[in-house]
Amino acid sequence: MSLKNGEQNDLSPKDSVKGNDQYRSPSGIHVEHEEESRNDFWQFESSNLFRHPRIHLEPQEKSDNNLKKFVIKKLEKSCQCSSTKAKNTIFGFLPVLQWLPKYDLKKNILGDMMSGLIVGILLVPQSIAYSLLAGQEPIYGLYTSFFASLIYFILGTSRHISVGIFGILCLMIGEVVDRELYIAGYDTVHAASNESSLVNQMSNQTCDRSCYAITVGSTVTFVAGVYQVAMGFFQVGFVSVYLSDALLGGFVTGASFTILTSQVKYLLGLSLPRSGGVGSLITTWIHIFRNIHKTNICDLITSLLCLLVLLPTKELNERFKSKLKAPIPVELFVVVAATLASHFGKLSEKYGTSIAGHIPTGFMPPKAPDWNLIPRVAVDAIAIAIIGFAITVSLSEMFAKKHGYTVKANQEMYAIGFCNIIPSFFHSFTTSAALAKTLVKESTGCQTQVSGVMTALVLLLVLLVIAPLFFSLQKSVLGVITIVNLRGALCKFKDLPQMWRISRMDTVIWFVTMLSSALISTEIGLLTGVCFSMFCVILRTQKPKASLLGLVEDSEVFESMSAYKNLQAKSGIKIFRFVAPLYYVNKEYFKSVLYKKTLNPVLVKAAQRKAAKKKIKRETVTLSGIQDEVSVQLSYDPLEFHTIVIDCSAIQFLDTAGIHTLKEVRRDYEAIGIQVLLAQCNPSVRDSLARGEYCKKDEENLLFYSVYEAMTFAEDSQNQKERYVPNGPSFSSD
């Protein structure tokens, strides 16, 4: 058998006879030896011969975690009423009351007016174009952008983001609208006359296709807004953390392919049903190629001319944005030129091109959402609400950090929620912040939320005076504007090589989300991306990195021996680091990698038992022979080490399975005479170990505050054990 001091001893027959009882009860040896070893361990620990004193920290008194008391305390605090609290509540809910009285007119007004004017000019054609994407009439896009700009001015905390119409949300709204129109029995190919549709609504007559479409859109918007306000109220904004940058990037790119596909029919002048549901992108392209011979040549030529103007000018704006005081509003110029050409050339009458039609001036009477539709659209609104607030909060925090101020994420959720709830009563659909317009707003001198008021005034001018002038505007022009604005999302492919070098896992998440969003559907794509992203997190912790550590020369620092050279491995001590939480998913991997890098105590124990049986049998035969005195040598090869130190600095938490695994590992190693020490456990892990009874009251010294302390303790205790070891053999197992 292996001796604790690594030596071999010869036993005479006389000595062997004394030990026969122990051999007949191997388990008795183990219990007796383990108890003796443990007593020696604590005796050594309490002696004064250690080179370094142990670190002892006094824990803070823990707060009372009684749920009932916590809830009562919160309710008492919430129900207290005073003039100061009422004032703070009002000012917190309406941030405009805080910052507007302090507004520096001379310093900020010029930049706010300039940025608001330019964003308003850009929003006019985009609002009209994105209305088609949402399955609505052009006027509703203008309503949406107008109300969102005003409400965010009152409730928002970000000085720079532009809240209004957003392509991805318009696509998601449009899919719901088309589905409900189909269920209601409306023709999904040919809409009723634009003029008659809107006249009926203005005069409160029977609701036709256009009326029902905006009813569905407003209802979805209302429900999404309620979700967002509820998220703010219950402070569940943490949901957005599951939408990583890679996931959002893949989702936006995948949805952009769907948007592009939905606009191709306008570029070609085709009257096609809008495909929805699973595989809509493929279905739409099949319909396009089947009807390609019906292409309207006038619409095709108009689309190509607009592309030739818009794409180069957009690139110039991007390349020379640092030199331009304001971006060239090329979209507005294209819309004006195309409208004039269509009107005076009578393109609709001569060539049958599809035009925007009558856009009324003024505002329609408020109308409540259709409460009967809410159960049918409630699930659709969840994804819309999450995407809307995730993009808004992330953009507001990004620009706040860039310009050195803070935003309140909860208030941002309230703001975007009410930007959807209130306008839903005024024939509007879902809004959120948009990166492209926010960048324009920032680059043109925006200083505060006053910029949003200027944007709203531009849109109000269009709504009251200019809107009817867009009657002859071709829908192909609006389709081109929508597609050109997707170039940022579609150009993300050029960033993939760099993303692959930085994180292959993020790149895979991006591709999975992009492909599922494009080829299946936007909602399923988002859900697939979230599920796959969470699976990747679990996968990363299922088989994390684990390594043996060595000591950096002339220091108390330990690092991975597989990552760095010239590290010193301490004789007789193995230091093991596991870089992940230890829980039910990776508990088996933890044991397997620890056993692989040190030794498997179960196999060693089995080998010792087998060897013990063979030597007992041999001894019995020898003693019963004719010889009076025979020397029998019982020995094992000594183990390479006596202590394992587990560096727990990277273990964020333990669950029940993790605690049980540590107990099992410790028990298995102690059975062969190897002590297990834990080092650098954070307070959470220490609490878990205490609750799981990993250490008994007299075993708290198994936990160390640093790896160096644990290593020193192991060396000193082993040195003292060798002094106390008796002359006779000391077996490490039964």
Swiss-Prot record:
Reaction catalyzed: oxalate(in) + sulfate(out) = oxalate(out) + sulfate(in); sulfate(out) + 2 chloride(in) = sulfate(in) + 2 chloride(out); oxalate(out) + 2 chloride(in) = oxalate(in) + 2 chloride(out); bromide(in) + chloride(out) = bromide(out) + chloride(in)
Record-annotated STAS domain positions? 563-714
Q: Where is this region: Disordered?
A: 1-38
Post-translational modification (record) = N-glycosylated.
Q: Which GO terms describe its biological process?
A: chondrocyte differentiation; chondrocyte proliferation; sulfate transmembrane transport
Keyword Transmembrane helix attached: yes
Q: Bias regions of kind Polar residues — which residues?
A: 1-11
Q: Does the keyword 4Fe-4S apply?
A: no
SUPFAM superfamilies xref list: SpoIIaa-like
Can you name one GO molecular function term for this protein? solute:inorganic anion antiporter activity
Function statement: Sulfate transporter which mediates sulfate uptake into chondrocytes in order to maintain adequate sulfation of proteoglycans which is needed for cartilage development. Mediates electroneutral anion exchange of sulfate ions for oxalate ions, sulfate and oxalate ions for chloride and/or hydroxyl ions and chloride ions for bromide, iodide and nitrate ions.
**Family indicated by similarity:** Belongs to the SLC26A/SulP transporter (TC 2.A.53) family.
Protein name, UniProt field: Sulfate transporter
Protein source organism: Ovis aries
Task: Give the gene symbol.
Answer: SLC26A2
